[in-house]
């Protein structure tokens, strides 16, 4: 579907959560961060978050979109505020790319990208969300473009090539 006349374009920075009820194109650039898209196929409303870490070490009263659990809670609250049920949204997950694959981690310790991927999947399951697609993990960054008028998400993945020299 073509971009509707008057559709707005919003670029999300890390830690931002956006929910729109008007035609909009949402964009973000992800490395080890994860984006969650929410789209209601009947209402053509939804949003996206760009979280940096799975959760905050210490709880705080105000929600903060930098943390996955809180960013998802913000999206759920927006859905409820628009008289819709979170389980009626199509949910897609993106990101969690290794940005420094040449740095070998201790096998007992997960890195931020892996923690974000595991957290996103666990949160989707815990909230019984309708997970329609995912493109997470591997190396490199992703450009995400999410069109609210039709629910399409476009992903451009730029992997990082690791040479033998880098792996040392």
From Swiss-Prot:
The region annotated as signal peptide is none
The UniProt entry, under InterPro entries, shows: CheD-like_sf, Chemorcpt_Glu_NH3ase_CheD, Cytotoxic_necrot_fac-like_cat
- GO BP, sorted A to Z: chemotaxis
Catalytic activity field: L-glutaminyl-[protein] + H2O = L-glutamyl-[protein] + NH4(+)
Q: What class of enzyme is it?
A: hydrolase
Q: Which Pfam families does the entry mention?
A: CheD
- UniProt KW keywords: Chemotaxis, Hydrolase
Please state the Enzyme Commission number of this protein. 3.5.1.44
> Does the record carry Plastid as a key word?
no
> Key word Lyase present in the record?
no
Report the Gene3D superfamilies cross-referenced here.
Answer: 3.30.1330.200
Q: Which GO terms describe its molecular function?
A: protein-glutamine glutaminase activity
Supply the NCBIfam families for this chain: PRK13498.1
Its biological purpose is as follows:
Probably deamidates glutamine residues to glutamate on methyl-accepting chemotaxis receptors (MCPs), playing an important role in chemotaxis.
Identify its protein family. Belongs to the CheD family.
Question: What is the name attached to this protein's record?
Answer: Probable chemoreceptor glutamine deamidase CheD
Q: Which organism is it from?
A: Pseudomonas syringae pv. tomato (strain ATCC BAA-871 / DC3000)
């Amino acid at each position: 579907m073509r971009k509707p006349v008057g559709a707005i374009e919003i670029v999300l920075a890390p830690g931002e959560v956006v929910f729109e009820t008007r035609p909009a194109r949402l964009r973000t650039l992800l490395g080890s961060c994860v984006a969650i898209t929410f789209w209601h196929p009947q209402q053509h409303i939804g949003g996206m978050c760009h979280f940096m870490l799975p959760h905050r070490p210490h709880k705080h009263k105000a929600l903060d979109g930098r943390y996955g659990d809180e960013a998802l809670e913000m999206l759920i609250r927006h859905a409820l505020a628009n008289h819709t049920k979170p389980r009626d949204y199509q949910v897609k997950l993106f990101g969690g790319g290794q940005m420094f694959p040449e740095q070998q981690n201790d096998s007992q310790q997960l890195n931020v990208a892996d923690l974000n991927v595991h957290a996103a999947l666990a949160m989707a399951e815990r909230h019984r969300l309708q997970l329609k697609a995912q493109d997470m993990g591997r190396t490199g960054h992703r450009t995400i473009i999410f069109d609210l008028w039709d629910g399409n998400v476009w992903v451009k993945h730029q992997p990082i090539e690791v040479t033998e020299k880098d792996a040392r």
